[in-house]
Amino acid sequence: MKIGINSDMGEGFGNYRICDDEALMSIVSSANVACGFHAGDPIIMDRMVRLAKQKGVEVGAHPGLPDLLGFGRRVIQMDAAELEKHMVYQIGALQAIAANAGHRVTHVSFHAAMGNMVNADPDMADVVARAIATINRDFIVFSQPDAEIVRAARKVGLRTLTLFLADRAYDENGHLVSRKLPNSVVTSTEAVAERVKRFLDSGTVQTIEGKSIKVEARSILIHSDTPGSVNLAGTVRRVIEQGGGEVTPATVLLN
């Protein structure tokens, strides 16, 4: 079985680092690089792109809302046109940095509140998908299954890669449990290993209510800001490889 591992990376600013990006880059097949609004800055973005190139890792834009203090997790009211411009700005910045480093951007993966907006609002999803297709029709859109952005992306001819979030709890409707609730973030390597093995074996996840639901995904996400993220990502890779799987970049998965 071929499957990807991806992580949101470069989510610091200045001298602040949220995790060991270098160690994480040795584990993943795709890096979603913060583009300066919720986290990241030009120096960090450049470092991430060059490190990804060195490690043979694909790079994607990880745009978020302009909310450095809230790490892009707070809702900011804006219409679809405003959201589109904020996204385009960030993708363009990473494209330029990647070109300067001799690498290229292959995908887009939305961060937190921005992701929630395009996942839930069909009008916003349509506007954003059209903008991505205008920038580069070869871009792959990373998202959760059944999100509006997946529908909108496919409508305009973009490829999509759906995700299983190994470090986040799901409810019985297949939605992520709010981070405000207990046990919404999975930090135990044993629990992550069990979840990944179950997903690989049966395509299911156990919800926070204890039920089993199907999850359709081609790549497994670990958030870099989850405590112990490097160990968790290493656990994901180990479970995949011990089961005979192959960690594979997104562009290869969708060929």
Curated annotation (Swiss-Prot):
Which E.C. number(s) belong to this protein?
A: 3.5.2.9
Keywords for this protein: ATP-binding, Hydrolase, Nucleotide-binding
Positions the record marks as coiled coil are none
Ribonucleoprotein: present as a keyword of the record?
no
**Known catalysed reaction(s)?**
5-oxo-L-proline + ATP + 2 H2O = L-glutamate + ADP + phosphate + H(+)
Q: Which family does it belong to?
A: Belongs to the LamB/PxpA family.
- Biological role stated in the UniProt entry: Catalyzes the cleavage of 5-oxoproline to form L-glutamate coupled to the hydrolysis of ATP to ADP and inorganic phosphate.
| Name of protein | 5-oxoprolinase subunit A 1
Origin species:
Bradyrhizobium diazoefficiens (strain JCM 10833 / BCRC 13528 / IAM 13628 / NBRC 14792 / USDA 110)
| Gene name tied to this protein | pxpA1
